[in-house]
Every structure is written in C-alpha cells, then in structure tokens.
Amino acid sequence: FEAIIKPLDYEVSKMRTIKSEDELKIIEKACRISSLAHIRAMKSVKPGMYEYQLEAEYVHEFMSHGARACAYPSIVGGGKNACILHYNENKNILNDGDLVLVDAGCEFNNYASDITRTFPVNGKFSKEQREIYEIVLEASKKSIETVVSGSNPLKAHETSVEIISQGLLDLGLLEGDVNEIIESNKYFDFYMHRVGHYMGLDVHDVGGKDINGDWLNYAPGMITTIEPGIYINESLDVPEEYKNIGIRIEDNVVVTETGFKVLTDLVPKEVNDIESLMNS
C-alpha cells in the first residue's frame, strides 16, 4: 500500500492558535494576576530602588495569586536600559527623573501572559517623556482597534508604524515625508520590532501563518499581543533631552465574534491615570 507522510506541526499549530473557552478562562486569569502585579509595581517604585527590587514586587504578586512562575525572564529597565529590547540583567539603580520599562507576565496553569508598562520612577512624566509616551499610546490604541476577525496582523503593524513615524516627524526627531520615512525604514532606528505576536502555552506562541508562511487573518479565539514602542538610544542624532527614553506599551488582546477584548486593561496606561495611581 502507499502511504503519504505529512508533518503535523502545521496542523498542531493551527489547533493552538484558536483558544477554547477553557483556555481563555485560564489566560484571562493569568492576565489579571499580571495586571495586579504591574499595579503593585507602580505603587511601590521609588528613586534609589534597584531594578531587581522592583522585579521582586512582581514575583511576590504572582505567587500570592497562585502563579508559581514567570512566563519569561522579566525585563525591568530604568533609564537607558529601557532602550535595550531584551534587557534582563535588572541590576541597576532606578534614578529620579528616569522612566522604567517593565515587561513582565506570569504563567498560570501552563498558559502565559505578557504585559509591558512604562512609568516614571518619581511618579511624574517629564515634558519630553510624555511627548514620546503619547505617540506610543496612540499607536497602541489604534493598533488594537485592528484586532478583529477578518483583519490581517500586517494591518496592526502597519498602523503602529504609520503613527510612530508621523509622531516622530511632528516632534522633529525624523525629517522628510512620512511615506518616504516608512518606505526607507528610517523609523527603524526608533522602532525596530513587530507590533505583536501570538500568545498561549508559549509567550511567543506558534501559529498565525498558513503553510506557505503568509499571515492568517485574525479569527475568534486568537490571542495576540499589541506592543508598539519607541527607543531613543544615546547614539541617535536627537536633542539631548530625548536621549535614553525607552517606552513600550503592551496589552494582550483576544479576537471575539463581535470585535476584540483587551485582557490587560486593568493596568492603567493613560498618563494621568498612571500618575494618579503612583501618587495616591
């Protein structure tokens, strides 16, 4: 007889891409625990703390709610460390006047969560920090709006690129025509990663592409992160007051039958809400 041997990885990936109701409940729980941890950190941070001490606040909150592990090594980057995408040494002092970028999420019953928030160590954004933050926030909101059934993940990324490029142009940190900036990838010096990835049993989960490697359209039950960012390292030719500002905002979003649901909206991300929480 004849037998046809086919790899199963693609079929298994498809199954993992669409979450069942039971899976969604677990992931929602993981997202809630991680959200509470970010809130705890915003209330706890103060100048003079070490990055690892702030990291400990997350671990404490995770375990207090039954999440015994982090979904990935936490990133706690203060000041210029926030401009390093996968910084996880977490060993430096958090200084007055700096921002701290924290990318941290727990694993609960084998499922991941993945949240990033950026907030001022002293509880108050500077003018320049706020200007950059508002660009990233706008990119976050508009990109999330594209996470609906039938839309393609490329649209979410392109939306974030357009908003970030225009925002940097408006501030004078990029020059030229916005379309030329995008086509020539000039924005890439400030925003060098994709806007999101699928999430589930792994924090960077499998699936999302067809057998030819093309992105599948969003469908109900898919969970993606949306995480635009701007990273202004000290080597860039920009005014001194903008250097070493690194900002990312990351939420976990599930596609529903009627639109989308943000699983991590418990954590504030509006500037006024963050400052109010930190100074309460």
Segments (PLM) and residue ranges:
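Active-site neighborhoods and metal-handling regions in enzymes and metal-associated proteins
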Residues: 1-280
